[in-house]
Regions:
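Internal alpha/beta scaffold segment
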Residues: 1-48, 52
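Extended amphipathic alpha-helical scaffolds
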Residues: 1-5, 37, 45, 49, ...
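Catalytic cores of large soluble enzymes that bind and process phosphate-bearing ligands
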Residues: 2-10, 24-26, 37, 56, ...
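Exposed alpha-helical structural elements
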Residues: 10-13, 63, 159, 214
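Residue-level signal for secondary-structure boundary elements
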Residues: 22-30, 56-60, 168-172, 227-228
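Dual-mode signal for accessory low-complexity, basic/Gly-rich regions
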Residues: 51, 67-246
């Protein structure tokens, strides 16, 4: 409804974001802790979901080939497909081929639990079909070295910044790509430096490089602040030992 739209709050948020980005500085190249804002965090998870597509695996263009049932990532990485959550963006009873969906783990404590196998590829590979892709991927909350009680947790971006103490907060990606065969990536970023959990100044014109397996094995935090309107329920996330170059 038009009456439910708070245009003034939206414009105020956009203005604040623009003002905070005035006067960016370059940081020295090096290894930093990296926090990724929930508005762009799915950029780093999308290549993982793509690599779990059986079409890529059958064509041998996936860096997660021959990974089903194996522990590839750390205990802190659990990705669920919450396809049957009523009334939520992305939820559905069937995929476009008519295969029934279900709530299920895609990655459970670092173990690959599912490939996405459509009916055509299932016949080519001689395996049972699943759903063709994730309906509503949800990254579960995590903080390295801390026990988070189910149903009693709230981990915001502010909490993650305080947990990481010092590093770079990424709020946008400026181009770049990842290699689907090797998992190597290079992305341009923009965002803010932070110290003692507080944002200090904007940064631009930096690159992050590495390998997606290594990156996700350096996961140290995942929040509970995924955007409700998004099909990809990916919260703010944090990694350690990320290579930045100016």
């Amino acid at each position: 409804k038009e009456a439910d739209l708070d245009c003034s709050a939206c414009s105020a948020k956009a203005l604040d974001k623009a003002v905070r980005q005035i006067g960016p500085k370059k940081r020295k190249s090096g290894s930093y802790r990296m926090v990724v804002d929930n508005s762009v965090a799915s950029r780093l998870l999308a290549p993982i979901a793509s690599a779990l597509n059986a079409s890529s695996i059958q064509q041998k263009v996936s860096f997660l080939e021959d990974s089903l049932g194996k522990k590839i990532f750390p205990d802190g990485l659990t990705l669920m497909d919450m396809a049957r959550t009523p009334g939520k963006s992305g939820s559905r009873l069937f995929d476009t081929e008519g295969v029934a969906t279900k709530d299920c783990p895609i990655i459970d404590r670092g173990v690959i639990k599912q490939y996405f196998v459509n009916t055509y590829i299932s016949r080519k590979m001689g395996i049972e079909p699943t759903v063709e892709d994730a309906s509503r991927p949800c990254l579960m909350p995590y903080m390295k070295g801390k026990e988070l009680a189910d149903g009693e947790i709230s981990v915001s971006l502010k909490d993650i910044l305080q947990f990481c103490r010092n590093g770079i907060l990424v709020t946008g990606f400026n181009g770049g790509n990842s290699n689907p065969v090797t998992g190597d990536f290079s992305f341009g970023i923009e965002g803010f430096a932070f110290r003692n959990g507080k944002i200090t100044h904007p940064v631009r014109e930096m690159l992050i490089t590495g390998n997606l397996k290594d990156l996700w094995n350096n996961l140290i935090a995942a929040g509970t602040d995924a955007r409700p309107s998004s099909r990809w329920q990916i919260p703010s996330i944090a990694f350690e030992n990320v290579s930045f170059s100016a």
